[in-house]
Structures are given as structure tokens and as C-alpha cells.
């Protein structure tokens, strides 16, 4: 479906498939919801809403910050859904769970961090500032090449990196390239957003999936995250930043039993 909203709220492209509890899937920076195509059949027991984030894929850009994006998504998606976000999408889903707890029944973050930027003064592991700066500078020069480089970094470390990059690229390029302003918005979010002080507000069941070989969200993030009875961590030993591509079977083994709690 395409979520049509009042004229002042731009259109979001949402591809809804399957039957069952509502599950929202949010992609990462530089790509679109087509990256989740391999999961369509595997998640058919859920009513899955594959969302193109604002300015990505077939969605129109939405000016503003992370909160603006979250507000637009909340208005376009069913209440009482499970929200799953990969990378930047995980940041969006986390903010949504914090701001709209009654709308979100459960949270899944995949290779995602509440604070993507490395903070040396706090010994917080993350992306070195110069890496995000480099991508920001390259955006104005060669958009397709910049996205391809980013895809390569996401697969780095995986034993099947070459195949992973090709699969990601083929899926992503089936839709229009992202809007340049949306890419800058996304980089700013990765650069500036720090949700760590607000994580205690998340009381919904929360599944966090990590890749031990992830070059963007280092494995050292996980031990520094809050723990509680409603939180489950799964570290995939041989996965990098795109575990649902490189290790789909292990990824599904992590999410399938966890999702089952919402079927009753």
C-alpha cells in the first residue's frame, strides 16, 4: 500500500505483505526497503510493512529531524505493531519506541546503535567521525559510487562479502537512488543522535541482533547497553553489518522464536 496522508504530510511508500501480527521493517542509510526482499517469504506469517524511509526508494523526502520522520511513520503505520529497524532504521525504531510506547508492541534492532558516532572521551565504540565526514563530502561528487562504497563497508568482515555486496546492490538499485537531502539528513542523524540517556524508557520486549564482525557497530557496543528481563541479545559470530543478507538462516533462528510471543 501507499500511505496517503494530508497534503502537508508527504507520501511514504509502504509495501504491505502477509497475514498476522503487524511487523514494521525499516532499512538503513543509503538503501531502501527492497533490501528485505529475501525475507518476504520467511516472514509471511506476519503482516509486514516494508517502509521506504523519507527520501529513500519510492518515498518523498520529509524535511526535519529524526522526530519528524518518526511522527510521519507513526501516522502512516498501524498501532500496536512490532517495529524492526536495521542500522539507521534501528535508530528510527528506537526513537519511535521511546516517544510512542503505546503504539509499539515490541522492538527489534538489527546491527544498530543508540549512538552511532564513536565518542572517544567516553570510550564509546562507533563509527570514526572522519568516516561519516568522508561520505558527506562524497555525496555531492558521485552519488551511486558513494552508496556502493557504503554497501562495501557494510559487508566487510563477512566471509561472503563479495556476494553480499552484489546482492545488496542489485536489490537497492531496483528502485530510484535516494534523495541527496535525505542522505544528508540520515548522515546527520548517525552523526548527532545519542539516545543512550533515554533507553530506560523502553519497556517493550526488545530483541537486539548484533554481528560480531560488524565494522560500523562494533561488538563492544553490546556489553555497554542496558540489560533487563525484557531485553534479549543475540550476537551472530560470523556476521557483519547485514546479518539478514549474509546469515539469513541464523538471523531467522534469532527472530522467529522471539516473534512467536506476539502471535497469541
From Swiss-Prot:
GO terms for cellular component: cytoplasm; membrane. The gene is bioH. Coiled coil: none annotated. It catalyses: 6-carboxyhexanoyl-[ACP] methyl ester + H2O = 6-carboxyhexanoyl-[ACP] + methanol + H(+). Monomer. Its EC number is 3.1.1.85. The active site is at 87 (nucleophile), 214, 241. This is Pimeloyl-[acyl-carrier protein] methyl ester esterase. The physiological role of BioH is to remove the methyl group introduced by BioC when the pimeloyl moiety is complete. It allows to synthesize pimeloyl-ACP via the fatty acid synthetic pathway through the hydrolysis of the ester bonds of pimeloyl-ACP esters. One of its GO terms (biological process) is biotin biosynthetic process. Pathway: Cofactor biosynthesis; biotin biosynthesis. Residues 23-244 form the AB hydrolase-1 domain. Substrate binds at residues 29, 87-88, 150-154, 241. It comes from Shewanella sp. (strain MR-7).
